[in-house]
Amino acid sequence: MEFVTALVNLQEESSCPICLEYLKDPVTINCGHNFCRSCLSVSWKDLDDTFPCPVCRFCFPYKSFRRNPQLRNLTEIAKQLQIRRSKRKRQKENAMCEKHNQFLTLFCVKDLEILCTQCSFSTKHQKHYICPIKKAASYHREILEGSLEPLRNNIERVEKVIILQGSKSVELKKKVEYKREEINSEFEQIRLFLQNEQEMILRQIQDEEMNILAKLNENLVELSDYVSTLKHLLREVEGKSVQSNLELLTQAKSMHHKYQNLKCPELFSFRLTKYGFSLPPQYSGLDRIIKPFQVDVILDLNTAHPQLLVSEDRKAVRYERKKRNICYDPRRFYVCPAVLGSQRFSSGRHYWEVEVGNKPKWILGVCQDCLLRNWQDQPSVLGGFWAIGRYMKSGYVASGPKTTQLLPVVKPSKIGIFLDYELGDLSFYNMNDRSILYTFNDCFTEAVWPYFYTGTDSEPLKICSVSDSER
């Protein structure tokens, strides 16, 4: 009954609402109803302004329909199912050979076909083993009965597997909970460590402030005393100046001696201590936080300055004095020895590392495509550029909307770069002591490319691959 109901429903869905026959070349209109193409064309034949659906009457401003090959295939399936069902029904009711109109009493073992007597003599079944239906049915019934036990065993085995797999969900939940607690604990340790570091550094700054303030006040007292002495001397000099010549010259030696022995206290100057910290290895969350976003950056040959030599794997670049003859490209750097990465970033978070070694000059960062290609050095006053670099005269500098002097505690030989496009953050890490060098907070309005400036020495810049960075 369920098969019959399903077949009836399939036939209804495969019928055209206009001609009530099986759909021929079915088409679908925008409201979702289906029709024969010819029926819909006739229905809309004399219409100009509006074209209503023949079923729901929803009107469209223009003729619009699309062919539905999937529905055409389903319609053909519905036809075949109806034909087969009718054929089976007749066979079941009559058990007669449709070809010879004789009772079906025999069975071809090789072809697995039910035959009448006349069919068994046909050339198709010559030399085939043919037996009575009763015997063939008994044989196949034994085969089916023999397969019952293996089927039951298979069901039992799979049910045990289901129970086992079900228990794995409990195991998974426990492991996930353990991992969650482990991560929470680790990050709590990092948070506490950072909090303690912050409090300690703030105390040090406060102590230093009080110490400097005390010395500054002491210096102010010395200067005030010096001013008082000068004022007293001034009054004394003014009194001596009106004395007689003899009295003035008698005391001239002591006055000169007193004036010459006056010394102005040195001005007190101060410089705050450079404070910083780096996460110890046991608390270092840097890998866990940013390494999952690591990308394999490769260099774009079409942007490389003519005097830059890019390695075969496009992971390293160095400057050479010999200038190569290469095709012009508007995105190529022709004045400064620079090159871009081949992958642009317009969303998401990305991390890559670059070995700078002991190069005397280098610049790393990101830039927008609007960056000018004809400037001599780093474009500190231009927009669309965020980078840090080392300069032979000015040391380490962050260049972007403004220029900032950097004072790394440890000289970096490998730089980590982390870009959070949506947040507008670009952070640079000194991978030697795992400290942060600088972070830009901006709003990226266009896609950005990794940027590499080599300087004019022969030492290369090397982009670390993912496998190298994980070591």
From Swiss-Prot:
A zinc finger (RING-type) spans 16-57. Residues 277-470 form the B30.2/SPRY domain. The gene is TRIM60. E3 SUMO-protein ligase that mediates SUMOylation of TAB2 leading to inhibition of NF-kappa-B and MAPK pathways by suppressing the TRAF6/TAB2/TAK1 complex. GO terms for molecular function: SUMO-ubiquitin ligase activity; ubiquitin protein ligase activity; zinc ion binding. The keyword Metal-binding applies. Pfam families: PRY, SPRY, zf-B_box, zf-C3HC4_4. PROSITE patterns: B302_SPRY (PS50188), ZF_BBOX (PS50119), ZF_RING_1 (PS00518), ZF_RING_2 (PS50089). GO terms for cellular component: cytoplasm. Residues 171-223 form a coiled coil. GO terms for biological process: innate immune response; negative regulation of non-canonical NF-kappaB signal transduction; regulation of gene expression. The keyword Coiled coil applies. This is Tripartite motif-containing protein 60. It comes from Homo sapiens (Human). A zinc finger (B box-type) spans 92-133. Keywords: Coiled coil, Metal-binding, Zinc, Zinc-finger. InterPro entries: B30.2/SPRY (IPR001870), B30.2/SPRY_sf (IPR043136), Butyrophylin_SPRY (IPR003879), ConA-like_dom_sf (IPR013320), PRY (IPR006574), SPRY/PRY_TRIM60 (IPR035786), SPRY_dom (IPR003877), TRIM/RBCC (IPR050143). It comes from the Eukaryota. Zn(2+) binds at residues 97, 100, 119, 125. Belongs to the TRIM/RBCC family.
